[in-house]
Structure formats: C-alpha cells, structure tokens
C-alpha cells in the first residue's frame, strides 16, 4: 500500500555544493554571553529576561505544525532518469521511512528520478503501525519541516539519512505518546520499537478480585 502512505515535497537542497558533511549543521538558538561588573548585574538580569522571552516565543512557534505543501499530482508519469546514475538513486531507507530524491506516482509507483528537486517520503511500507489521516499528516508535516530546515544543504544520501533518522525518532515518540499503535494484523509482527505498553487495573487485585476488601478469617 505504497500509494496510501506517500508524500512528495519540493526541496531546495543544492546539487552544486560538494558532498561535505561540515556544511550540514543542526539549527541552534543563538545566545549572547555578556560578562559584566558587579555594578552591572541589573543589566545582565534584563538581558537574561529578554533571552528567556525569546526562547519561550521560539518554543511556541515550534509547537505549531509546519503547513503541508505537497507537490501537485502529475499525470502520465514514467520511470526515467535511472540510467544517468547507473541504475542507482539517491535515497535513505529505514524500517518505517523511505526517502527518494525523485517524484513517485502514488498510484502507479512510476519512478521519475529526473525530478530531483522533489523528495518523496514513503511511510511505513510494511504497515507495522495503524495510521489515520491525522497521524499521517503529523509525520508529513514534520518531514516538510525538516526539508525546509536543510534548505541549501548538499543533496546527498547523508542529508537524506539525517532527515530519515529524525523522522524515525518522531515516529517512535508518537508510538510512546499513544498517537499510533502497532498493527496486530501486520504480516510481520516483531515490535521493532519496543513491546506495547499495557496498563493494568490494580484495584481488583488489591480488593481480592471483586472490588471489595477481604474479611479476616
């Protein structure tokens, strides 16, 4: 069911830059450290307060999901561009996340690698989890956020692996938060992200099984 769980986003990763790992840096919040005299402690406190407000504002912005900007569906897509790379393609493949630098038709699965300005995400191809529109869109939104974050980075398999790894961690978080669950009807069921968590009701155990306290003999 590749067609059911795929998303294609436009990317601005650079094909011109050399494959240099040093060019890819995680986004960090810039902070200014100021050394002041004891008489200037009040100035430092004001700066710390302003920095805290900026960080809180940044956290609020991070909580807002990135709007989806899927590529418009194309017609009559044909597989092409593979010969230019000797039958290989730029990709990052993990258990639940497959990312390709190409446009993949969601219905016919035709693979057009000549459109390397697009990244296609195939989500959970083995259907290990149960997905609905909301949970799928959360993953797609996070994927879109990562694509935007790496704008200007070299288009290499290393960059795609960074994105894929972050998406895998995000899926794990969704599982632990109870936003998705294992598909018990999956063809292969091995709980790759840990066994399901089961909550027990201990009230019956403490009360002797019927919810009433036991009387002493």
UniProtKB/Swiss-Prot annotation:
Give the EC number(s) listed in the UniProt record. 7.1.1.-
A GO biological-process term: NADH dehydrogenase complex (plastoquinone) assembly
* Molecular function terms, GO-annotated: oxidoreductase activity, acting on NAD(P)H, quinone or similar compound as acceptor; quinone binding
Q: Name one GO cellular component term.
A: plasma membrane
Its predominant location is plastid
Q: Which reaction does it catalyse?
A: a plastoquinone + NADH + (n+1) H(+)(in) = a plastoquinol + NAD(+) + n H(+)(out); a plastoquinone + NADPH + (n+1) H(+)(in) = a plastoquinol + NADP(+) + n H(+)(out)
What is the top-level taxon of the source organism?
Eukaryota
Question: What enzyme class is recorded for this protein?
Answer: translocase
Q: Cellular location of this protein?
A: Plastid, Chloroplast thylakoid membrane
Knockout mutant characteristics: Malfunction of the NDH complex.
| Membrane protein topology class | Peripheral membrane protein
Q: Where is the transit peptide?
A: 1-21
Q: Which residues lie in Basic and acidic residues bias regions? A: 50-62
Q: Which UniProt keywords apply?
A: Chloroplast, Membrane, NAD, NADP, Plastid, Plastoquinone, Quinone, Thylakoid, Transit peptide, Translocase, Transport
Looking at the record, which segments are called Disordered? 48-67
Subunit field text: Part of the chloroplast NDH complex, composed of a mixture of chloroplast and nucleus encoded subunits. Component of the NDH subcomplex A, at least composed of ndhH, ndhI, ndhJ, ndhK, ndhL, ndhM, ndhN and ndhO.
PANTHER family listed in its UniProt record = NAD(P)H-QUINONE OXIDOREDUCTASE SUBUNIT M, CHLOROPLASTIC
What the protein does comes down to: NDH shuttles electrons from NAD(P)H:plastoquinone, via FMN and iron-sulfur (Fe-S) centers, to quinones in the photosynthetic chain and possibly in a chloroplast respiratory chain. The immediate electron acceptor for the enzyme in this species is believed to be plastoquinone. Couples the redox reaction to proton translocation, and thus conserves the redox energy in a proton gradient.
- Which family does the entry's similarity section mention? Belongs to the NDH complex subunit M family.
* Protein name (record): NAD(P)H-quinone oxidoreductase subunit M, chloroplastic
- Species, as recorded: Arabidopsis thaliana
């Amino acid at each position: 069911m590749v067609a059911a769980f795929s998303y294609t986003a436009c990317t601005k990763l650079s094909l011109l830059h050399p494959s240099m790992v040093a060019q890819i840096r995680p986004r960090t919040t810039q902070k200014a450290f100021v050394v002041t005299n004891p008489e200037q402690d009040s100035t430092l406190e004001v700066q710390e307060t302003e920095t805290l407000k900026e960080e809180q504002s940044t956290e609020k912005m991070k909580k807002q999901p990135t709007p989806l900007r899927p590529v418009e569906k194309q017609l009559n897509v044909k597989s092409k561009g593979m010969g230019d790379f000797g039958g290989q393609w730029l990709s990052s493949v993990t258990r639940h996340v497959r990312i390709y630098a190409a446009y993949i038709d969601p219905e016919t699965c035709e693979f057009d690698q000549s459109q390397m300005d697009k990244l296609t995400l195939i989500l959970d191809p083995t259907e290990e989890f149960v997905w609905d529109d909301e949970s799928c869109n959360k993953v797609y939104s996070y994927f879109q956020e990562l694509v935007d974050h790496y704008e200007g980075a070299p288009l290499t398999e290393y960059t795609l692996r960074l994105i894929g790894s972050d998406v895998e961690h995000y899926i794990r978080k969704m599982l632990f938060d109870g936003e998705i669950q294992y598909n018990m009807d999956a063809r292969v069921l091995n709980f790759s992200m840990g066994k399901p968590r089961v909550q027990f009701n201990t009230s019956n155990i403490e009360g002797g099984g019927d919810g009433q306290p036991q009387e002493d003999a």
